[in-house]
Amino acid sequence: MDIERTMFWAGLLEILFVYLAFQTALARTKESSVGEGTGDLLKKSRVVGNFAEHVPLMLIMMMFLENDGYEGFITILGLLFFICRLGHIYGILYQDGFGPKENPARAIGAMGSWALRAIAGLKCMF
């Protein structure tokens, strides 16, 4: 099984995840040892939780697709997914509001991630 591209994206996403988790841990030492807290800690907790919800299954689908011969597709899919995750993270941490007008980075990051996951899921099925 040749999954070098997926391994690259898995490594890059894991490094980002460790960084986000570390930032959350630092915020937790200032606010609350248990729970999501408020303000900065709440935002950082949501970023880590959301990342953990979206990334693992996407990487599994990417591995299946790459193993099936879609190497070029995986490169593009991984890049777009990484950009969407960065946008979502930026939107939660640095922009206020929820809707597309108030927080475009979060909206584009979330909707882009959903769309890419749906595309990967359909490609796995067919």
Sequence positions of predicted segments:
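Alpha-helical transmembrane segments
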Residues: 2-19, 71-79
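A loop-to-helix transmembrane entry motif
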Residues: 10, 41-55
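Transmembrane alpha-helical segments that form the membrane-embedded catalytic/substrate-channel core
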Residues: 13-30, 82-92
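Cytosolic, membrane-interface loops and tails of multi-pass inner-membrane proteins
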Residues: 22-46
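Core segments of transmembrane alpha-helices
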Residues: 49-62, 113-117
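Short alpha-helical packing/oligomerization segments
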Residues: 62-84
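Interfacial loop-to-transmembrane junctions
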Residues: 89-115
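Juxtamembrane boundary at the C-terminal end of a transmembrane helix
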Residues: 119-126
